[in-house]
Regions:
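Cleavable N-terminal export/targeting peptides
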Residues: 1-33
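Short glycine/proline- and aromatic-enriched beta-strand/turn motifs that initiate or cap beta-hairpins
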Residues: 20-77
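Repeated loop/turn-to-beta-strand initiation elements of outer-membrane beta-barrel proteins
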Residues: 32, 64-70, 96-102, 130-136, ...
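Membrane-embedded beta-strand positions in outer-membrane beta-barrel channels/transporters
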Residues: 33, 55-59, 87-89, 121-123, ...
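Transmembrane beta-strands of outer-membrane beta-barrel pores
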Residues: 36-44, 64, 72-76, 104-110, ...
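Solvent-exposed loop/turn segments connecting transmembrane beta-strands
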Residues: 43-52, 75-83, 110-120, 140-151, ...
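Structural signature of outer-membrane beta-barrel channels/translocons
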Residues: 59-61, 91-93, 97, 127-129, ...
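Outer-membrane beta-barrel "beta-signal"
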Residues: 122, 128, 155-162, 179-192
Length: 192
C-alpha cells in the first residue's frame, strides 16, 4: 500500500509543473554525486534544439536529511536561441522517497537580445525503487521565472555508476521573454 501511495504521488508530481537527474540511492552524509545529461528529441519553443550536452547536476549530502545541489540545464534552439538555467538548492528529505527543495535561480536567455534573471525555485522530488537496481524518479518545481517538471527511470550499473533516461519540461518567463523547453534526455551519474 505504501508503494502505491508513493507511486500515485510521483505520478501527480509529473502531471503538475528544478530538474534533477537520477537521485542518490541510500544517501549517506559525505556522499557526492555528479550527473551529465545528453538531450535528444529536444524542443525549444516549437523548434528543434541542437544542443547535445544539456546540463547536469552535482549533489553533496550534508546529513541524513539535508543535501545541497547545483543544477544546470542548457538548450540551444535551431534558430540559435539559447536558454541557460542554473539553480543552487537545498533539499530536505522527509522520507527516503520524498523530499522538498528550495533555492536560488539564475536564468540567462540569448535571443534577439540577452536577458538575465535572478530568482527562486521551490518544489518536490520523489523516488521509488522499482526493482533491485531500478528506480523511478520525478520532480516538480515552481519559481518566479521557471516552472519545470521531469519524470524518469534510473539503473544502477555498479554501486557508483548509474544511467538514466528522463523527460523534462521547462516553461521560462524572463523579462517578457516566454519560451518552453522540453524533451528526452539520457545521462550517466557517478557517486564518489
Amino acid at each position: 500500500m505504501k508503494k502505491l501511495i508513493i507511486a500515485a504521488t510521483l505520478a501527480a508530481l509529473a502531471m503538475t509543473s528544478a530538474a534533477m537527474a537520477a537521485p542518490i540511492r541510500d544517501p549517506q552524509p559525505g556522499d557526492l554525486k555528479a550527473n551529465a545529461n545528453y538531450g535528444f528529441d529536444q524542443k525549444e519553443g516549437g523548434r528543434s534544439a541542437k544542443s547535445l550536452l544539456t546540463g547536469g547536476d552535482v549533489t553533496y549530502v550534508l546529513s541524513n536529511h539535508w543535501d545541497i545541489q547545483y543544477v544546470n540545464n542548457y538548450t540551444k534552439g535551431d534558430n540559435d536561441n539559447k536558454i541557460n538555467e542554473n539553480y543552487l538548492v537545498g533539499n530536505y528529505r522527509f522520507t527516503p522517497y520524498l523530499s522538498a527543495f528550495a533555492g536560488g535561480s539564475y536564468v540567462k536567455t540569448e535571443t534577439y537580445n540577452t536577458t538575465k534573471s535572478y530568482g527562486y525555485q521551490v518544489g518536490l522530488k520523489g523516488q521509488i525503487p522499482l526493482a533491485a537496481r531500478w528506480q523511478g524518479f520525478a520532480s516538480v518545481g515552481v519559481g518566479d521565472d521557471v516552472y519545470t517538471y521531469e519524470v524518469g527511470v534510473g539503473y544502477d550499473i555498479t554501486p557508483n555508476w548509474d544511467a538514466h533516461v528522463k523527460y523534462r519540461s521547462s516553461s521560462v518567463d524572463v523579462d517578457n521573454y516566454d519560451d518552453d523547453v522540453k524533451g528526452w534526455q539520457v545521462g550517466m551519474g557517478y557517486k564518489f
